[in-house]
Amino acid sequence: MWLTACSLIVTRAAHLAGPRNRGKAVGQVMLGLSVANVLGVPAAAWLGETFGWRSAFAIVVVIGIATVVALIRVLPTLTGMKTTDPLTELGALKRSQVWFTLVIGTVGFGGMFAFYTYLNSALTTDTRLSVSVVPFALMLYGLGMVTGNFVGGYVADRSVAVAILGGLTATALSLGAFAVLAENAWAALILTYLVALTGSMMLPALQTRLMDVAADAQTLAAALNHSALNIANAAGALLGGVVVSAGYGYLAPSVVGVMLAVAGIAVTVVALATARHQPVGS
């Protein structure tokens, strides 16, 4: 249900913003998700510890109801959007550029998730940070995601291709630098922020590209983007676990992330080259 709601929100926000501001609109929606992670997770943990685990779920219900009421009251009537149906939406699965974009997201973000899954262990084992400092590092990661969505939206409005390729390249460089410099505490903290920033700046661009290449099937395409990110989460954690289990240490997932980001660049280049020889919506 959450994926369905989010895909609807993204497509409606992009429509309201207009062609020149779609990236910023999508980025602002994704920005909300990042802020929810930064503030919601620790808040829920505090509520659970203080008032019991049921209190966190109760707050979610209250916030959800308040959000629905707010949408009913302030969301303008949407005009000019094409109506669609399930068969039309499923047509997105026939378009090669939709699949290319989903693969870019899966592979590119896989490296970011490989890094994040083992970040706690890397900071305490290799950087030798105190356990009490790790929450601050995770907060930096969350702030990086917030900044990345904000920056990525502006870049996507100017060039979706630049936002994707630039984000993947910067992510590869940041992950590589972390693998080399993580023994220095200041470098590790700064790079933790940069990995999150560079990775997250791709999100608005990928979502915008999916809406472009999906033609009349934008809602399903938007939902599939979140599915691709969930696959990236699982695959990144799995690949990171493989290299850690093989004895390469907790910095090895960052190297895996570099490889996946480079693979994402390769897929992006192929997708862009192929798109030049295909009709719109193929």
Feature locations, PLM:
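Cytoplasmic helix-loop-helix junction between adjacent transmembrane helices
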Residues: 1-32
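A late C-terminal transmembrane helix in Major Facilitator Superfamily
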Residues: 213-249, 257
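C-terminal transmembrane helical hairpin of 12-TM major facilitator-type secondary transporters
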Residues: 162-206
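Extracytoplasmic gate region of multi-pass secondary transporters
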Residues: 99-138
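Juxtamembrane intracellular "pre-TM" segments in multi-pass secondary transporters
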Residues: 74-104
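C-terminal membrane-cytosol helix-exit motif in multi-pass small-molecule transporters
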Residues: 61-81, 267-271
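A membrane-interface helix-boundary motif in multi-pass transporters
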Residues: 49-61, 242-261
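Helix-to-loop junctions at the C-terminal end of transmembrane segments
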Residues: 148-160, 244
